[in-house]
């Protein structure tokens, strides 16, 4: 993503919350990501998350549908979960940067982030 941005002379920013700014708050809520992953593994009869990932996304014949398949996968994986305290903190930080960038550009911006964060950021 950085190389492509450089080629088209796009401005780039790292928008994740720096480690030094993260609170040490511990969230003891169940790990929704692990629960969702276990459900997907059972539903697809796959042995582990690597096998599932290869089956869903590494087959070159599926490359044209990859963006929508990834969006669907992470939306299902995340569900309605707000995430743990650290992810909520990180996503709030990212959302502020995204809002700032949209104001600077009078519109759309491209965000490259982990798939777990994409559904939450799209709602903010």
Q: Where do the PLM segments sit?
A:
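Compositional signal for N-terminal targeting/processing segments
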Residues: 1-124
